[in-house]
């Protein structure tokens, strides 16, 4: 599949990019949210370009959807390659490890306050920007930080519209930004990983190809047994191309439509939805990119 089929950079993303650049001089801390299943593919390479000389925190969200070993690999990777000042895993959905994030934010805020008050300033505000790609969990994270539903929450890419300044507490303000991708993905694999995890709208995707690529990856990781158990597949179902395996899933799960024909589209969306919801096991998709793509993201 060519990259052009899965690029998604509508006009509002260009406007958001310009807005982020415009507001960056006001910001003290840039908190970039990435998806634990695709920490590198979900890391917008434009953010470091905008955030030079800022305190940078990478939050690996959705940590509950991968193994601890996977998390440790990416924390070490980001730290050793100087991607950020701090790297932290959490789950905005469950609240896991939120206290650690609060501590980091408070520490950076206190450092700025002490520095400026030593110069005679009496009132010091710290401003935090939350940035990331669509559907990575920014709004849920903000709700955790603020403690109320001030940002709204959606489970589709592109939910948050326009910038939002949110007062967290005295002396600490947060700028929420809509999720943005970038004009051209560095590789076909990056685009495909974004599509598999739901960062790109399904409506514009060659969805059959996306589901097939997910199954290919699961085969490469020897995860056939999970598919067998989840979808009642037999060994013989795997002696065929992945497109036919999806047909077998429709057959074994009795997914049928008018005329009693197999509903392959239902099977396709079911496989993707199950992975996105963590029902096909805890695993990531990005390991192969760690060495080959590193310079594109720093």
Regions found by a protein language model. Give the residues of each.
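Helix-rich effector regions associated with P-loop NTPase G domains
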Residues: 1-29, 37-38, 43, 50, ...
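Structural beta-sheet core signal
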Residues: 32, 58-60, 130
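Glycine-rich, phosphate-binding/catalytic loops in enzymes
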Residues: 48-50, 74-77, 147, 190-194
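Canonical P-loop GTPase G-domain recognition
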Residues: 64-131, 150, 255
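Conserved active-site beta-strand-loop modules that form the wall/rim of enzyme catalytic pockets
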Residues: 92, 142, 172-175
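Alpha-helical scaffold segments in soluble metabolic enzymes
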Residues: 100, 104, 140, 213, ...
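Short, structured loop/turn "capping" segments at alpha-beta junctions
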Residues: 112-116, 143, 149-155, 221-226
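Glycine-rich phosphate-binding P-loop
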Residues: 127-147, 151, 177
């Amino acid at each position: 599949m060519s990259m052009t089929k899965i690029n998604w950079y509508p006009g509002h993303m260009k406007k958001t990019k310009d807005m982020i650049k415009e507001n960056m001089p006001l910001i003290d801390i840039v908190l970039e949210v990435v998806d634990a299943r695709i920490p590198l593919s979900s890391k917008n390479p434009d953010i470091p370009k905008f955030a030079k000389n800022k305190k940078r925190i990478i939050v690996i969200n959705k940590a509950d959807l991968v193994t601890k070993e996977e998390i440790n690999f990416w924390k070490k990777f980001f730290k050793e390659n100087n991607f950020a000042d701090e790297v932290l895993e959490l789950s905005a959905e469950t609240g896991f490890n939120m206290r650690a994030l609060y501590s980091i934010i408070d520490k950076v805020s206190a450092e700025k306050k002490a520095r400026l008050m030593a110069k005679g300033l009496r009132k010091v505000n710290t401003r935090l920007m939350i940035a990331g790609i669509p559907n990575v969990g920014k709004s849920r994270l903000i709700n955790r930080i603020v403690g109320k539903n001030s940002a709204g929450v959606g489970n589709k890419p592109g939910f948050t519209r326009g910038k939002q300044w949110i007062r967290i507490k005295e002396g600490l303000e947060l700028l929420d930004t809509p999720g943005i991708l970038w004009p051209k993905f560095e590789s076909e694999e990056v685009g495909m990983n974004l599509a598999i995890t739901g960062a790109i709208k399904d409506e514009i995707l060659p969805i059959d190809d996306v589901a097939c690529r997910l199954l290919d990856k699961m085969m490469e990781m020897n995860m056939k047994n999970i598919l067998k158990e989840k979808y009642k597949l037999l060994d013989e179902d795997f002696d065929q191309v992945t497109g036919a395996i999806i047909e077998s899933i429709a057959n074994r799960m009795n997914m049928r439509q008018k005329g009693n024909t197999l509903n392959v589209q239902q099977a396709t969306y079911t496989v993707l939805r199950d992975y996105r919801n963590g029902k096909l096991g805890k695993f990531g998709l990005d390991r192969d990119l760690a060495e080959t793509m590193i310079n594109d993201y720093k």
